[in-house]
A protein has these predicted regions:
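Helix-loop segments that flank and shape redox-cofactor active sites
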Residues: 35
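Histidine-acidic metal/acid-base catalytic patches
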Residues: 12-24, 28, 38-182
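Active-site-proximal, glycine-rich beta->alpha crossover segments in alpha/beta enzymes
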Residues: 1-12
């Protein structure tokens, strides 16, 4: 069967093989963390926590090897310190999916409004860490609830994602202005 090490070795083999083309074309790869961040159905998960990123960047140090920083996937693992990770890897985060989770049991959670006070993910702390770390990538609100009677694909409600985009835009503006005052 597939082991953690075999899967990691295959990922490293793939990334090393494509890095010359990424260098030539100026393309950044941005691996999305495993969702959820624990093994499921006998399948190993290898990009779940800070140590996994450290191992990946040690194996493939090329700066075109980067991250999609998904606060939903990483936040499902209560063991992850998301603001710390955001700041540590800010120069390797090329795409950020920011969303809020509310824990409902040991491994159960549900997605909620993007504001920090709506759940257990410190969205403000993450945005602050990204800005302080020099983040220069793309951001989008990840998943939205269906609100106000909206009939949309689950997780992709337009209204909630639009509110999330406005909230995140405001957070980035506030953090950047606060940093410029210091």
């Amino acid at each position: 069967g597939m082991t953690h090490q075999k899967l990691f070795d295959n990922l490293v083999y793939f990334l090393k093989a494509i890095m010359p083309a990424c260098d030539e074309a100026g393309v950044n790869m941005a691996i999305h963390p495993d969702d959820p961040p624990w093994d499921m159905f006998g399948l190993p998960r290898i990009i779940c926590k800070e140590e996994d990123y450290d191992n990946l960047f040690a194996a493939v140090p090329n700066m075109h090897n980067g991250i999609t920083f998904c606060t939903g996937s990483l936040g499902a693992g209560r063991f992850n310190d998301l603001p710390k990770m955001a700041k540590k890897y800010a120069n390797r985060i090329y795409f950020a999916h920011l969303r809020q989770l509310k824990y409902d049991g040991e491994i159960n959670f549900y997605e909620n409004g993007h504001q920090t006070d709506c759940g257990n993910v410190d969205v403000y702390g993450i945005v602050k860490a990204l800005v302080e770390g020099g983040f220069d990538g793309y951001v989008r609100p990840d998943h939205g609830r269906n609100v106000w009677g909206e009939d949309a694909k689950p997780g992709y409600g337009l209204f909630d994602r639009a509110m999330g985009a406005c909230y995140l835009s405001g957070l980035f503006e506030a953090v950047e202005k606060d940093m410029n005052r210091k």
